[in-house]
Structure formats: structure tokens, C-alpha cells
């Protein structure tokens, strides 16, 4: 085992020989990070990425100034999808160490799950991983049901079944109940719905290779919302919450769905498929119908839903949509408290009407006349939320995954959003 490289924090600028803008320097004791009070967490994360890039795989966070958030910022930048890294953590009090340990367990689970190859992580495996994580955190407070394949069709989950039927791996709906009250009749406080497309080829509206090569990550919404529930439980969530993961492959075969097909949903809506690569909203619709039936105070769905959200925000922010201004502001306050980046994008009543079809109530994609793709996607989902004006948040997870490394992040999943959603769920 190699000796650990000591990483210390300093509020003094680096020696002038390192340059006036230097944020880190090397000394006889190890590496010093020079905080300037402007964006200290970002500075630590960027420095950690550079330290990892130098091939240093064993570090000790030493000296004064370390706390949970600073140690976590270091790990967020230091962790990568391949190779082993060892960190000797700073001395923290019990509460801070517990918080750090829970982040390491749960958010690393989210990142590792999103990074897993599609060959290893199909719909059933994703659902089972979610069950294992949540049962490990909450034990007997968890109950669940897994419905798959033809059982979905027979029970009316036609959006999920339609999208997933083209794969040899059957589509799966995970319906999970976290009930800490012990009362089977306890009201449901929140319902969480996640898009779990374990690989998205685009179907017959096939993607180019440059857009398909990262589509193992199209289940990022499901992983994020699962991690958020698990993390909220570790922070003392004492209200009943239900989780719905809509898991499928979107592949091409003789049994795959086709353009012009019409899906009949349980809430009476019909949808014409005019783009098989707009499949996420088709599976989420089934989960949102179930969520609405629970009459919760809060519904949150999370999905890597549109390229339009990434065009607007890049990979740095998650996109937030809601008709409920007060609730949207609560989510944004939670994001600020957790130092995670969310940005609200427009969602208006007219977006609900920008999906016209000649043969059904809705088209699953907007036409060229209605180019606000992220907003029309949110508008589509609103048709499956019973009381869409209140208590519903849609998160288009544009910050879930990066195809290549940047100064703060390695290539792959980020885990962003888990803490924000957990904060909202546990806020009084």
C-alpha cells in the first residue's frame, strides 16, 4: 500500500512562484488547497479532479478546516468510473461523519448504477437494485411489488409495455411503499416516479451512434429518485412515500412499437406515437397515473427526458418544471441549501396543447411549429397528473451524466439531485 498524500486546506494564497491564480500547491507535507472564500467547494472539487489526474490514488484529508461538505466536494471530484481510490477522511463529529457515510453509500450507489453497462443492468436488475438499496436502509418499513412483461399489458400499463416489448428483457414496473408509520391506512405524503430506460436505441426513430453511446444512462432519473428516497430515510423521513420505477429497454425488433401506433392509457387518454425516441414520457405516464391515484400532497418525477433541456442548460443544471410556484420555490431553496444546481424552465397551460394528433388525444412529440421540446414534454406529462396545477414537480435530469470529463467531474454519472430531493422530502 502506498503512503497517503496529505491534502490540507489553507486560507492563505499560494507562494507567488505557483502563480497569482494558483488554487493548489505542493509542499513538503503534501498538497495544499488555497481557499479564497468565493467558491470553496467548487475549488476543492476541481483540485481533487486534478489530483486524480496526476495518478495519486491514496490521499489523507488532513489538518483543520475540513467538514462534511468540503470532504464530500473532494470526493465528488476525486471519484472516477475506473480504478481504485483510497481516502483517509478527516476527523469529524458523529453527526457529520454519519452524513458523510450516508452520502458515500447512497450517492455512490446512484453514480455506480448509472455507470453500469446496459448488458449488466436490464429492467429487472435495475428494479432489484433499487429494492436492495431501500431495504438495506429501511428494512421492514419497505414493501414492494414487481410487475413485468405480459402482466403489465393485462393490468393496463400499456405505455410501459409498448415501449419495452421490443426487447427480450421484459419491461418492469416497481411499486415500492416506504411506510414508517406501521399503519396500512396512513396517508401517502409523496409519490416519486422515475424513468428507468436501461438502454435507449431510439427504437425505429433510431439514434445516431454519437447520441446512442451514452444511453446506458437513460435510467438516470430512476436511479436519482431512488437514491433521493434512500437518502431522505437516512435523514429521518417519517412520512409515507411511494416509489414507482418504470423500467424498460427501447430497442428495435419485429415486436417493437412503430410510428403511428396508438396507446390507450388507463386514465382514458390516447397517445399517437410519432417518434419512438420520445419513449420516456410514454413510460412515465403509467407511473404518474398510479401516483395520482394515491392522492398524495406531493408528486415528483425525475427523468433524463429531453435533449432540449441539455441544450438550454448544458450538463450543469437540472431543469425544473411546475405549475405550482410555491412548490417550485421550495425545491429551489432545497437545491441552494444542498449546493446543487437546478433551474426552472417555462411550463404554461398552452404547452399542454402543443402536441396535436389527427388520430388521438395527444401526440408523443411536438411538431416543428412547437419547438420548446422540454416544455412540451412536461406539458405531455401533465395530462397524466390528476391535479397538475398543485403539488407536482417534473425534473428533467440534464445534469445526471457527462460523456466526457470536465474540470470538476470525471466522465460518467454525477449523483446531482439526490440531496436536493431528499431535502425537500424531509423539510418541515
Curated annotation (Swiss-Prot):
<comment type="subunit">
    <text>Homohexamer.</text>
</comment>
<dbReference type="Pfam" id="PF00883">
    <property type="entry name" value="Peptidase_M17"/>
</dbReference>
<dbReference type="GO" id="GO:0006508">
    <property type="term" value="P:proteolysis"/>
</dbReference>
<feature type="binding site">
    <location>
        <position position="279"/>
    </location>
    <ligand>
        <name>Mn(2+) 1</name>
    </ligand>
</feature>
<keyword id="KW-0479">Metal-binding</keyword>
<feature type="binding site">
    <location>
        <position position="218"/>
    </location>
    <ligand>
        <name>Mn(2+) 2</name>
    </ligand>
</feature>
<protein>
    <recommendedName>
        <fullName>Peptidase B</fullName>
        <ecNumber>3.4.11.23</ecNumber>
    </recommendedName>
</protein>
<feature type="active site">
    <location>
        <position position="281"/>
    </location>
</feature>
<feature type="binding site">
    <location>
        <position position="200"/>
    </location>
    <ligand>
        <name>Mn(2+) 2</name>
    </ligand>
</feature>
<feature type="binding site">
    <location>
        <position position="195"/>
    </location>
    <ligand>
        <name>Mn(2+) 2</name>
    </ligand>
</feature>
<keyword id="KW-0378">Hydrolase</keyword>
<comment type="function">
    <text>Probably plays an important role in intracellular peptide degradation.</text>
</comment>
<dbReference type="GO" id="GO:0070006">
    <property type="term" value="F:metalloaminopeptidase activity"/>
</dbReference>
<keyword id="KW-0645">Protease</keyword>
<feature type="binding site">
    <location>
        <position position="277"/>
    </location>
    <ligand>
        <name>Mn(2+) 1</name>
    </ligand>
</feature>
<feature type="active site">
    <location>
        <position position="207"/>
    </location>
</feature>
<dbReference type="InterPro" id="IPR047620">
    <property type="entry name" value="M17_PepB-like_N"/>
</dbReference>
<feature type="binding site">
    <location>
        <position position="279"/>
    </location>
    <ligand>
        <name>Mn(2+) 2</name>
    </ligand>
</feature>
<keyword id="KW-0963">Cytoplasm</keyword>
<keyword id="KW-0464">Manganese</keyword>
<dbReference type="InterPro" id="IPR008330">
    <property type="entry name" value="Pept_M17_PepB"/>
</dbReference>
<keyword id="KW-0031">Aminopeptidase</keyword>
<dbReference type="GO" id="GO:0005737">
    <property type="term" value="C:cytoplasm"/>
</dbReference>
<dbReference type="GO" id="GO:0030145">
    <property type="term" value="F:manganese ion binding"/>
</dbReference>
<comment type="similarity">
    <text>Belongs to the peptidase M17 family.</text>
</comment>
<dbReference type="Pfam" id="PF12404">
    <property type="entry name" value="DUF3663"/>
</dbReference>
<dbReference type="InterPro" id="IPR000819">
    <property type="entry name" value="Peptidase_M17_C"/>
</dbReference>
<feature type="binding site">
    <location>
        <position position="200"/>
    </location>
    <ligand>
        <name>Mn(2+) 1</name>
    </ligand>
</feature>
<dbReference type="InterPro" id="IPR011356">
    <property type="entry name" value="Leucine_aapep/pepB"/>
</dbReference>
Amino acid at each position: 500500500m502506498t503512503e497517503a498524500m496529505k491534502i490540507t486546506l489553507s486560507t492563505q494564497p499560494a507562494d507567488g512562484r505557483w502563480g497569482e491564480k494558483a488554487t493548489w500547491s505542493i509542499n513538503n507535507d503534501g498538497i495544499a488547497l488555497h481557499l479564497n472564500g468565493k467558491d470553496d467547494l467548487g475549488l476543492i472539487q476541481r483540485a481533487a479532479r486534478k489530483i486524480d489526474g496526476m495518478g495519486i490514488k491514496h490521499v489523507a484529508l488532513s489538518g483543520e478546516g475540513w467538514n462534511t461538505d468540503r470532504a464530500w466536494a473532494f470526493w465528488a471530484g476525486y471519484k472516477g468510473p475506473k480504478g481504485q481510490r483510497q481516502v483517509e477522511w478527516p476527523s469529524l463529529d458523529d453527526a457529520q461523519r454519519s452524513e458523510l457515510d450516508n452520502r458515500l453509500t447512497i450517492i455512490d450507489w446512484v453514480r455506480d448504477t448509472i455507470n453500469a453497462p446496459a448488458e449488466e443492468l436490464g429492467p429487472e436488475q435495475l428494479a432489484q437494485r433499487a429494492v436492495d438499496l431501500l431495504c438495506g436502509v429501511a428494512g421492514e418499513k419497505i414493501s414492494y411489488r414487481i410487475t413485468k412483461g405480459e402482466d403489465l399489458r393485462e393490468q393496463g400499463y400499456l405505455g410501459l409495455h409498448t415501449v419495452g416489448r421490443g426487447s427480450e428483457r421484459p419491461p418492469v414496473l416497481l411499486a415500492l411503499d416506504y411506510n414508517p408509520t406501521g399503519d396500512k391506512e396512513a396517508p401517502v405524503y409523496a409519490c416519486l416516479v422515475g424513468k428507468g430506460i436501461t438502454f435507449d436505441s431510439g427504437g425505429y426513430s433510431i439514434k445516431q451512434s454519437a447520441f446512442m453511446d451514452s444511453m446506458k444512462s437513460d435510467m438516470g432519473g430512476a436511479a436519482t429518485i431512488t437514491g433521493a428516497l434512500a437518502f431522505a430515510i437516512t435523514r429521518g423521513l417519517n412520512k409515507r412515500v411511494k416509489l414507482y420505477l418504470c423500467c424498460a429497454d427501447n430497442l428495435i425488433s419485429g415486436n417493437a412499437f412503430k410510428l403511428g401506433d396508438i396507446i390507450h392509457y388507463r386514465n382514458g387518454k390516447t397517445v399517437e406515437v410519432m417518434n419512438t425516441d420520445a419513449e420516456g414520457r410514454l413510460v412515465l405516464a403509467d407511473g404518474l397515473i398510479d401516483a395520482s391515484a394515491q392522492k398524495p400532497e406531493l408528486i415528483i418525477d425525475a427523468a433524463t427526458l429531453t435533449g432540449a433541456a441539455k441544450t438550454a442548460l448544458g450538463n450543469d443544471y437540472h431543469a425544473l418544471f411546475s405549475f405550482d410556484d410555491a412548490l417550485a420555490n421550495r425545491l429551489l431553496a432545497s437545491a441552494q441549501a444542498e449546493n446543487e444546481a437546478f433551474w426552472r424552465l417555462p411550463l404554461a397551460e398552452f404547452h399542454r396543447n402543443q402536441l396535436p394528433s389527427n388520430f388521438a388525444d395527444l401526440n408523443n412529440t411536438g411538431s416543428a411549429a412547437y419547438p420548446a421540446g422540454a416544455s412540451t414534454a412536461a406539458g405531455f406529462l401533465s395530462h397524466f397528473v390528476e391535479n397538475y396545477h398543485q403539488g407536482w414537480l417534473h425534473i428533467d435530469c440534464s445534469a445526471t451524466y457527462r460523456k466526457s470529463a470536465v474540470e470538476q467531474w470525471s466522465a460518467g454519472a454525477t449523483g446531482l439531485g439526490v440531496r436536493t430531493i431528499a431535502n425537500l422530502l424531509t423539510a418541515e
